[in-house]
Amino acid sequence: IKSSAASDVYKRQFLFLGGFLLQGFYEELVFRGFFMISIIRKNTIFVAVMVNSILFGLTHGFNNGFQVLALLNLILFGIFESIYLLKTGNIWGISAIHSMWNFIQGNIYGFNVSGMAQSQSIFIFKISNCEIFSGGTFGLEGSLLTTIVLLSAINMVILYNTALQLQ
């Protein structure tokens, strides 16, 4: 691990954070706030969650290093975000999660985010050649580790809300 701790890096990170906050909010507004809610009006919640999550995954299909595991993980991320929105009714929460997911991967740890390299990060990691764990050129979103994290997150958001309802 190398630290690129020059003060200009931190200034740029602050600007990137603003960009990622806008990007995350925009994607959540479009996919969950518009597509999913529009689909729910004429279909089941299950259909709405799956359709908007698959569309979300497919929009990243032309990104560098895109592969089947990346598509699966992006769909799982869409499912997590959809359930979170349905359980909480809070688009700000899912926007913040989405934005920070991208920002931390790319601008803090230096991983590619959905196949896009970041110009600078606070830390620089040497990625292993084992693409199943590193996600290869797509980044961590194409990793089996991310699949495990997302499946756990989906279960937690379902169980957490259920636990609140039981109280």
Please annotate each region the language model reported.
Residues 70-132:
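Functionally important transmembrane alpha-helices
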Residues 13-14, 22, 46-51, 71-72, 95, 130-151, ...:
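Hydrophobic alpha-helical transmembrane segments
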Residues 20, 44-61, 74-75:
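Small-polar-interrupted transmembrane alpha-helices in polytopic inner-membrane proteins
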